[in-house]
């Protein structure tokens, strides 16, 4: 019995030696979980386990709300900066990281960014009227709605700064990528790039220079508004971008009759720059929706194509139960392994994520096909 058995084993081994080896494909650190992949690749889809970040009631600085996230991809992970509000009603930024784009692996125990002198101007409160502003509930001011852009080895952040009384301005800061991913929050001193005495929100920095200059997209209504500078150091506290306030007028007979502003930083494609934007419909008021447009690569003031339908609408419970109902507000988006991950705030209270096959989204926008977000049941 033993001899035939050895002969059989030897034969098998010989066969294995002569078989052709197929090299294994390296696994990506980011993978789409089967339970969230749509059978129809042209449809954006929410993560079924949304929200991915919720208020931490044991943490004084993020106990009330965690929302409006921005994101960058680096070191095989998605790095998220989100707005947080706690017991003092002061808005700060928190940090979280995800290896698969969905599950939060780590969440910072301390704020990643606090504008130390957010009361940045002496205010004559007796003679200066207080504006009626309560974006997300940060009654006592702070930092709001961050937008991250990674250029070379440096992370740039634009955000809205509110002094708690009458000034809502755009500020710019930056940090080395190495410090950022290691949670060493050595941010550069912030500098205001919007003028005093004006209200501005939703400004973003392009991820690369255009025609040799840095480009800041600071408005989409009444037209595309972009500021070009040779060096970001030109913003020294005396130079400001003069932006025309949104007119609110969108495309006639369309869902985006009231344009609000840009979402995440633009993403480069072969067709142009992908820009996600927030808008409302006069026929469906009080509901923030997300649309998409393509801007020309060399002249991004020119709109190449625009989605006929919103790619995201506030239809889920977590987008309607919170500080402000009917809100989906995206400040971050990354492309990984051919998938677009969109990070957004729901109801000004929680952080959520939705995905779509990147090429399918772009082709649908260019061909003007309706794009609709669905939730997998």
Show where each model-derived region lies:
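Polybasic, lysine-enriched low-complexity intrinsically disordered terminal tails
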Residues: 1-34
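Beta-rich carbohydrate-recognition and catalytic domains
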Residues: 27-68, 72-141, 150-204, 208-258, ...
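A conserved acidic, glycine/proline-rich C-terminal tail/linker
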Residues: 319-333
């Amino acid at each position: 019995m033993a001899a035939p058995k050895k002969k059989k084993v030897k034969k098998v081994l010989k066969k294995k030696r002569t078989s052709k080896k197929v090299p294994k494909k390296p696994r990506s650190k980011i993978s789409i979980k089967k339970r969230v992949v749509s059978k129809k690749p042209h449809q954006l889809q929410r993560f079924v386990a949304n929200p991915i970040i919720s208020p931490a009631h044991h943490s004084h600085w993020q106990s009330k709300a965690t929302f409006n996230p921005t994101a960058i991809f680096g070191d095989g992970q998605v790095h998220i900066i989100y707005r947080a509000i706690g017991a003092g009603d002061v808005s700060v930024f928190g940090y979280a990281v995800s290896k698969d784009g969905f599950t939060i692996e780590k969440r910072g125990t301390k704020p990643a960014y606090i504008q130390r002198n957010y009361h940045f101007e002496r205010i004559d409160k007796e003679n200066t009227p207080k504006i009626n502003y309560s974006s997300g509930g940060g009654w006592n001011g702070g930092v709001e709605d961050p937008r991250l852009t990674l250029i070379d080895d440096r992370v740039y952040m634009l955000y809205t700064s509110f002094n708690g009384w009458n000034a809502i301005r755009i500020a710019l800061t930056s940090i080395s990528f190495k410090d950022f991913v290691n949670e060493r929050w050595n941010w550069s001193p912030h500098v205001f790039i919007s003028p005093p005495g004006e209200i501005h929100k939703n400004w973003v920095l392009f991820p690369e220079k255009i025609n040799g200059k840095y480009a800041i997209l600071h408005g989409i209504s009444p037209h595309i508004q972009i500021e070009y500078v040779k060096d970001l150091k030109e913003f020294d506290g005396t130079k400001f971008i003069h932006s025309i306030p949104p007119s609110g007028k969108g495309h006639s007979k369309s869902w985006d009759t009231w344009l609000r502003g840009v979402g995440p930083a633009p993403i480069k494609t072969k067709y142009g720059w992908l820009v996600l934007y927030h808008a409302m419909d006069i026929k469906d008021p009080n509901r923030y929706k997300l649309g998409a447009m393509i801007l020309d690569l060399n002249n991004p003031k020119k709109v190449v194509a625009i989605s006929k339908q919103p790619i995201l609408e506030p239809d889920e419970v977590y987008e309607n139960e919170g500080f402000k109902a009917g809100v989906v507000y995206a400040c971050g988006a990354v492309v990984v392994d051919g998938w677009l991950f969109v990070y957004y705030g729901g109801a000004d209270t929680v952080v959520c994520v939705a995905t779509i096959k990147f090429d399918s989204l772009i082709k649908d926008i260019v061909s003007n096909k309706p794009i609709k977000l669905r939730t997998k049941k």
